[in-house]
């Protein structure tokens, strides 16, 4: 099991009111915990890390000798001069490469870095899962809030429809006005029903990321509020360069290319190997009425030195390619640093703009609510007509949706800033 370091990022939370007895409560931290334990992608990544850890051994690197046992039983019969021969042999031998140009050490370093890269990939998967859960959780809250807004607009439309029906029964309204109010109400009802489906889909998507049953329902504890605290760009850049996991993985990839270059250089060294063991043989020959039996036990020990003098330029070309790949990996590191810095600057600008957009959306919604309250009285008193009243309802609907989206966008920006600066990984250790 790989030990990874992480910090769960949670926007400031206020606990909700009484919970439904039929539904289990779910906070953002609980959703993160479920996903980190059960997410399908993380389970696969953990298995890959475990496999890389098993491969990272001195045995795979070639440090230790190999021991083998051989046995054979050969029988032959000469037809022209009848002779029957039986040969039984067995042997055990040890082969050990004592020196091969430090290839064993270079191979072990490569295996260690492959395990490190696999662990880094798991860390990236954890970061992505945390970010997806945060946005998935708040997407559910966003869709639920939109449903509440649509419910309010539908209630207003229903009240207007019932008002027109009552006026018609008293002779104060014509069929045209009633039908218009009915169409508006039915349209708002359809929007409300569609939004209910959107809410259920958002919950199912969240359940999938947590590996929960699709039909599982929750009472979501966390409020739909953003954290609007400010950032310093210099601090973000510093954290990104030191803690960004994708950049760390790119550094590990560069080290792997350096290992590959060292492995190719080791091909220019001689190889010194040891072979030792013991052989046993038993031979039986029968010709006519006589037989001959021989037995032998032969221990042996050999040292072999080999050196490739010429390989038609294979080693030279392989080393040249390895050095080219190493230099390309260095360029990729610089490219990654530049790309991440650009992305960070963009995210920082978006975050600051979205803080201001939220303030604008708050003012817009406040004005729309006041206008809606005033227009309802004016509509019933006949100062404005049904078309004006409907326009004001739509303005409120747009303003409410715009504010909810502004909140979600701000949460998204904060989540992306935390991800790119390595904020989901910290000094606290946790087993995954």
Question: Which stretches of residues belong to each language-model region?
Answer:
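Acidic, low-complexity, intrinsically disordered peripheral segments
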Residues: 402-432
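Sec/SRP-type N-terminal targeting helices
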Residues: 43-47, 60-61, 84, 98-126, ...
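Small/polar, glycine/serine/threonine/aspartate-rich low-complexity segments that form flexible
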Residues: 22-24, 70-100, 107, 220-230, ...
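Bacterial Sec-pathway N-terminal export signals of envelope proteins
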Residues: 21-68, 174, 214-255, 308, ...
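Short flexible linkers and secondary-structure junctions
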Residues: 22-139, 175, 272, 276, ...
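A short glycine-centered flexible hinge/capping loop motif at secondary-structure junctions
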Residues: 168-172, 379-383, 420
């Amino acid at each position: 099991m790989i030990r990874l370091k992480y910090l769960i990022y949670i926007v400031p939370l206020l606990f909700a009111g009484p919970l439904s007895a039929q539904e289990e409560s779910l906070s953002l931290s609980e959703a993160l915990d479920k996903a980190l334990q059960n997410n399908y992608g993380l389970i696969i990544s953990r298995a890959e890390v475990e496999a890389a850890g098993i491969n990272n051994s001195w045995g795979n690197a070639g440090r230790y000798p190999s021991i083998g046992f051989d046995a054979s039983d050969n029988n032959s019969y000469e037809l022209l001069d009848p002779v029957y021969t039986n040969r039984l042999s067995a042997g055990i031998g040890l082969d050990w490469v004592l020196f091969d140009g430090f290839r064993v050490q270079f191979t072990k370093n490569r295996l260690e870095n492959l395990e490190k890269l696999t662990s880094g990939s798991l860390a990236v998967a954890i970061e992505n899962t945390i970010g997806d859960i945060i946005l998935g959780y708040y997407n559910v809250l966003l869709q639920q809030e939109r449903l509440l807004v649509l419910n309010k607009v539908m209630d207003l439309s229903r009240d207007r429809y019932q008002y027109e029906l009552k006026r018609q029964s008293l002779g104060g309204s014509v069929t045209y006005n009633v039908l218009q109010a009915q169409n508006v109400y039915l349209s708002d009802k359809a929007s409300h029903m569609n939004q209910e489906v959107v809410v259920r889909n958002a919950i199912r998507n969240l359940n999938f990321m947590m590996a929960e049953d699709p039909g599982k329902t929750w009472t979501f504890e966390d409020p739909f509020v953003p954290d609007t605290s400010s950032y310093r760009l210099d601090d973000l850049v510093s954290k990104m360069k030191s803690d960004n996991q994708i950049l760390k993985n790119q550094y590990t990839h560069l080290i792997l290319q350096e290992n590959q270059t060292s492995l190719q250089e080791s091909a220019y060294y001689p190889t010194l190997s040891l072979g030792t063991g013991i052989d046993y043989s038993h031979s039986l020959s029968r010709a006519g009425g006589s037989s001959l039996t021989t037995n032998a036990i032969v221990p042996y020990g050999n040292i072999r030195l080999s050196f490739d003098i010429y390989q038609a330029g294979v080693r030279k070309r392989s080393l040249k390619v390895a050095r080219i790949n190493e230099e390309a990996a260095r360029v990729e590191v610089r490219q990654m640093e530049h790309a991440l810095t650009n992305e960070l600057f963009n995210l920082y600008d978006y975050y600051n703009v979205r803080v201001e957009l939220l303030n604008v959306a708050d003012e817009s919604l406040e004005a729309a609510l006041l206008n809606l309250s005033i227009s309802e009285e004016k509509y019933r008193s006949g100062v404005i007509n049904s078309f004006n009243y409907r326009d004001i309802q739509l303005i409120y609907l747009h303003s409410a949706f715009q504010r909810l989206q502004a909140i979600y966008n701000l949460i998204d920006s904060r989540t992306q800033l935390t991800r790119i600066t390595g904020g989901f990984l910290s000094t606290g250790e946790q087993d995954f």
